[in-house]
Amino acid sequence: MKKNRVFATAGLVLLAAGVLAACSSSKSSDSSAPKAYGYVYTADPETLDYLISSKNSTTVVTSNGIDGLFTNDNYGNLAPAVAEDWEVSKDGLTYTYKIRKGVKWFTSDGEEYAEVTAKDFVNGLKHAADKKSEAMYLAENSVKGLADYLSGTSTDFSTVGVKAVDDYTLQYTLNQPEPFWNSKLTYSIFWPLNEEFETSKGSDFAKPTDPTSLLYNGPFLLKGLTAKSSVEFVKNEQYWDKENVHLDTINLAYYDGSDQESLERNFTSGAYSYARLYPTSSNYSKVAEEYKDNIYYTQSGSGIAGLGVNIDRQSYNYTSKTTDSEKVATKKALLNKDFRQALNFALDRSAYSAQINGKDGAALAVRNLFVKPDFVSAGEKTFGDLVAAQLPAYGDEWKGVNLADGQDGLFNADKAKAEFAKAKKALEADGVQFPIHLDVPVDQASKNYISRIQSFKQSVETVLGVENVVVDIQQMTSDEFLNITYYAANASSEDWDVSGGVSWGPDYQDPSTYLDILKTTSSETTKTYLGFDNPNSPSVVQVGLKEYDKLVDEAARETSDLNVRYEKYAAAQAWLTDSSLFIPAMASSGAAPVLSRIVPFTGASAQTGSKGSDVYFKYLKSQDKVVTKEEYEKAREKWLKEKAESNEKAQKELASHVK
């Protein structure tokens, strides 16, 4: 996550946002290079069960220990992992994978346990289905027969379209062609599971602080995990591809965001290999002087961070509201599209981003769409171009809006005031009294998160006026914050009006990986983003989300022409943008000032899945000297050229897999 892509990249992960090297290959080899890597992690996992958890806190710990069928190479192409080769039928419905012989399962102590076989992948998906995986949306409507198994229509998993033809041949049968299918397979719900080991562990399987509760077939072995303290890995010396593992040890220290300066201090002392910097921190001017030739900005990631709107709030344990009428007024306001649009246009995204990136780097992280605007393209037009062409149909306020990354195309005080005036007239006619009070929760330990929400407060109150809207910041402990946002058990526990603790990273290379999560039936994510888990809630109907469902479903049915498919998904994104139910703000990772001792562009690169993120350490190379900005820029220029050539070659080779 996810990546994650997962809504697990919510609030706190932004604290450590920064792509470790944005990742590509370095031709150099230095046997004397440092073999240890140190940095931070920001949330303890609730479980190590990678098949059921879609949270980044689990991905951080498990992605380095478990290999699936594919990984990503240094240029973002899918690369063979446990799958040595693959083919797809001409109708696009049957995918067959040749399992690499000699890939083994190991205990956390490095003892060989068993060989990885095709059956382990069948076991993995069955386990995910039986345990109601948070990531089941990736497979449920794709794998033939899986939806019937999940609904109970069928109780025989052998009717599901995943088969171990023999020990070294795995086959998936799909409901409809999915050109992006293989890109899903780097995500953990499709990883293997040794059934014998799982059974032997019983209820102790995948315990969150017990490395012995898992088996490992990946580049690293988990050696230790102490809650709110540390995560430790060592190289798997018997890993099938150990030549591409250049680190011997990885040590991640827990970081709650309360001491931003600690990242640079530990980098300078040598404890950390990398440091995300915060230009608004008290020591930044000193750091900038000391490292003036070394600070560079990473590339913007594919994940999105923004603000969710709770359309069905039920709990008020953390609130500044003193009367029921204030609660009713806020709910009515948030159900009003013009009011939500006023908030959307009132957010100064550059100021919001500047709270962690500083003024110089603020624009680099700004994002105006839920789907990254250049995530896919239809001919010469990016996805953002397709959306921009359709938005004006919803109103003149969308004419000429620039949706590209790296600039704030939505902040417009005049538009915000105009939309608010329409909302106020309608709400007053409905008996609503002003100002509207908006409760926004923050983790009191996270300085940069608090500063972003304070920026949101300032933008909204300045543009709309405190006589109209008041943003009430609710400070609480880290655990309290997580329990009413990220880890909330259900929608009734989502105790907020607007939440900045929401973000998403794509899981596979198709717009649906973003847009599906806000369908009314995606309760695991709609509760976190929009405060509801009942698809038939009156609030859901009132804001028109059933129309959004129709648009997304119509796009999903288009499988023969990708350009038409992307046009239809752009229609769904246009509806979502106009609805302002989710207020986009910035990329959830990257576009950040950093210091690094990682060789630039060494590591797996990908916009999707769990094998190209900033938490996957295969391929990474460390060096003694701090990377200079000049070195980074030269490496980036070289990498971009090589990447374009490599991606084109990989695209042409796809045809050879159609049988």
UniProtKB/Swiss-Prot annotation:
Membrane topology listed for this record: Lipid-anchor
Domain of life: Bacteria
Lipid-carrying residues in chain (N-palmitoyl cysteine): C23
Signal peptide start and end residues: 1-22
MF terms (GO), sorted A to Z: peptide transmembrane transporter activity
Covalent lipid sites (S-diacylglycerol cysteine): C23
GO cellular component annotations of the record: ATP-binding cassette (ABC) transporter complex; periplasmic space
SUPFAM superfamilies linked to this entry: Periplasmic binding protein-like II (SSF53850)
Subcellular location: Cell membrane
Single Gene Ontology BP annotation: peptide transport
Pfam families reported for this sequence: SBP_bac_5 (PF00496)
Keywords: Cell membrane, Lipoprotein, Membrane, Palmitate, Peptide transport, Protein transport, Signal, Transport
Listed InterPro entries: Peptide/Ni-bd, SBP_5, SBP_5_CS, SBP_5_dom
Protein task: Part of the binding-protein-dependent transport system for oligopeptides; probably an oligopeptide binding protein.
Family: Belongs to the bacterial solute-binding protein 5 family.
PANTHER family: PERIPLASMIC BINDING COMPONENT OF ABC TRANSPORTER (PTHR30290), PERIPLASMIC OLIGOPEPTIDE-BINDING PROTEIN-RELATED (PTHR30290:SF10)
Record's protein name: Oligopeptide-binding protein AmiA
Origin species: Streptococcus pneumoniae serotype 4 (strain ATCC BAA-334 / TIGR4)
